[in-house]
Every structure is written in C-alpha cells, then in structure tokens.
C-alpha cells in the first residue's frame, strides 16, 4: 500500500529517452517503448496546426526488461527521423503501449510504423502506416490491440482516417477501411460476442464495432464528444465509452445488437451531465465505475448497471494531474498522478484514500500488477514495487 524512493522498491531501472508506456508483462519479460532525442536538425513551428516545434532527431525504440531484476535484456531501434509534427510537452513522442501474445510483441509508433519482434528481440516484420496530421499540440497516441490472430491499428487524424487489421505472424494487411473521423487517441477494444470477436473503437462521430475477420461494421452509435481519448471498457455484456473534452458523455451499450444503435434500447444508460475524463480510461471494479477528471483531480463513481451516481466530483487531495488510467487490485484502486504521486484508494462506497505515495518521476503510463508486485513506468525510470 505504501512506497517511496527509499521504501518497498524491489528495483528501479533508469530508461533511455522518454516514454509513457503502460508496462506490458508476460512471464518474466516487461516490454516498453521510448523515444530518444539525438539532436541534429529541427522543424519549423506550424502555427496553422498549433503544434510545438520539434527540437531535433529522435530514435524510436522497443525495450525488454527482466521482470525479476529490472535489467534491460534488449533494446532495439526501429526508426530514426525528425518527426513531421511536434507535440505538447506533457505528451511526448512515445505514448504508445505494445501488445503481446507470449510469443511475439507488436509495437506501433504511429506515423513511424508498426513492428513485430520475438521475445529475443529479433525483428520479425515491419509495416509502414500512414503519416498522420494531428490537430493542436496533442501528438499521436492510440496503441495497437490484438484480436484473435490480427493486430488492429486505428489511425484517426485530420486527413483520411483509417483502421487496419494485420496478420499477426506475417504483417500482411488482412483488411483496411476508411473512417469518417477526426483525430482520436483511444485504443481499440477486442470483445467476444456470441463466439465472434468484435473490435470496438471510440471516436467523435460514432462508436463503431468491426468484425475482426472481415472489417465490416457490426454496429455503431453516436453520442460522444470530440477528442476521444479514453479507451472503451467492457463488463457483463456491456461496453462503456466516455469522453470529456468540449462537453461530457458516457454511454453504456449492450453488446449483441447490430446496425445503428443511436437512440435505441441498446443504449442502457447515458450521462451527459457529470464531468467525464478527457484522458484516463474509466475503471470498472466490482460493479462500480470509477472516473477521474484529470485537470481538477476529481473522482466520480457510478453503479455500472444503472448508471446511478454514487460519488460526484470528489476532489482527491495530494495529486495534481492524472493522465494514467487507474488500476484495481486486492480491493484497492491505484491512481498515478503526473507529478509522481500515486494515491491508493479503498474500493468501497466512499473510496477513502489509504495512502499517498511519491516517486521522483512523472507517471503517465498506467500501472500493472502481478502477484504482490506493482509496476510503474515513469517518464525516465521503471519501478517494481514490492513489500520488503
């Protein structure tokens, strides 16, 4: 429950470059992504797109760490270039998280391509993606998802958006489809419905669910606001989608339907009144939905079945900004903040703060837990937290 730089740290590993990856863990391996500045030429500030200027060349890397010791087992550079667009200082150029099936690991760097490695760090295949034009200073950020034997990548931006399904072992494109959407940052969610895998995507115009085999749209539903960043979550046959930029929206949609579900009984409940998260994905734990409003550090909770509000906009003392998505384990909710503070909440009706823990790093990646160990990726360090 408690830790600091000097308490209950099993190991701490300095990482090259900068990143906001959620640690992806399989057995004794941890996979991360990062971007390393290497200097050199710069790009001009693009006032039309309101992006920040890029300060030089970057190397984009995939890392594998030993889960027991924190040692870096291998580090592979996949791309080096001056990025074509800048980014907000709070985001960076490596906000993506990889995905693995225990044999291979797939890492997307957005406009810099999609890469497949084996667990020994051998590059199996790579595939170029489209160069994205992201409005404002936000940069790119949607991570890939693994659906059956396909790797799914959503590339929503200000030009022609697309969704791709790649054969996981070869990198061949199984299908790709245009999407009528501006930039989004949500990661696609694979769900199994009646023995058939669907891929649910959050976006400004429509939440859509695609058939994994064909890419055909199974259902869609409007109702979200702009700049969709939180990833959909699933619980007990429903998918939950939220947005909190330029308005608020939260929809609970019953799975198993087809067609346009807007305004139908398939939308079990919706909430457009309360402040919803702009960045962190909602958490569902033991029938309760937890949402965190990242800039004002406010917690709201809801009954997942009815949508009834339990806690509305309760300020969380001790934390400033929240980009990481919260995690639940052992009856507790773990909420990392951007300044290095992680709150531990009791998963009860009042969500009381049990501990306030501080590390010397910014934490934007969501935590991961295995057994009695908690893994936190800071911008420059990887931590394994365990009771001494």
Go through each PLM region and give its residues.
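Noncatalytic, solvent-exposed loop/strand surfaces
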Residues: 1-388
């Amino acid at each position: 429950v408690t830790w600091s730089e000097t308490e209950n740290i099993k190991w701490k590993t300095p990482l090259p470059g900068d990143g906001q990856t959620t640690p992806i863990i399989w057995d004794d391996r941890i996979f991360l992504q990062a971007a390393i500045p290497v200097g050199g030429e710069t790009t001009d500030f693009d006032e039309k797109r309101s992006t920040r200027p890029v300060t030089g060349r970057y190397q984009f890397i995939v890392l594998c760490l030993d889960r027991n010791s924190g040692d870096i087992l291998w580090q592979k550079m996949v791309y080096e270039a001056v990025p074509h667009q800048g980014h907000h200082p709070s985001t960076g150029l490596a906000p993506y998280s990889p995905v693995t099936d225990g044999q291979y690991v797939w890492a997307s760097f957005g406009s810099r391509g999609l890469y497949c490695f084996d667990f020994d760090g051998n590059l199996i295949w790579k595939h170029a993606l489209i160069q994205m034009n992201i409005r404002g200073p936000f940069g790119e950020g949607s991570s890939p998802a693994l659906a059956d034997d396909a790797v799914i990548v959503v590339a929503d931006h200000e030009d022609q958006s697309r969704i791709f399904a790649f054969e996981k072992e070869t990198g061949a494109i199984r299908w790709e489809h245009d999407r009528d959407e501006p930039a989004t940052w949500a990661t696609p969610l694979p769900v199994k419905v009646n023995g058939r895998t669907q891929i649910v995507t959050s976006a400004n115009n429509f939440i859509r669910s695609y058939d994994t085999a064909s890419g055909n749209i199974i259902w869609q539903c409007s109702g979200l606001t702009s700049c969709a960043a939180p990833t959909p979550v699933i619980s007990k046959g429903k998918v939950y989608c939220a947005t909190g930029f330029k308005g608020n929206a939260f929809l609970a949609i019953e799975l198993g339907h087809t067609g346009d579900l807007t305004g139908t009984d398939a939308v079990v409940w919706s909430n457009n009144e309360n402040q919803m998260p702009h960045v962190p994905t909602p958490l569902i734990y033991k029938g309760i939905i937890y949402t965190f409003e990242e800039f004002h550090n406010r917690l709201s909770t809801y009954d997942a079945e009815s949508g009834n509000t339990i806690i509305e906009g309760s300020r969380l003392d001790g934390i400033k900004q929240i980009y990481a998505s919260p995690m639940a384990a052992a009856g507790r909710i773990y909420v990392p903040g951007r300044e290095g503070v992680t709150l531990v909440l009791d998963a009860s009706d009042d969500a009381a703060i049990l501990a306030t823990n501080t590390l010397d790093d910014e934490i934007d990646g969501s935590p991961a837990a295995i057994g009695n160990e908690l893994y936190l990726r800071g911008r420059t360090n990887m931590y394994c937290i365990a009771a001494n």
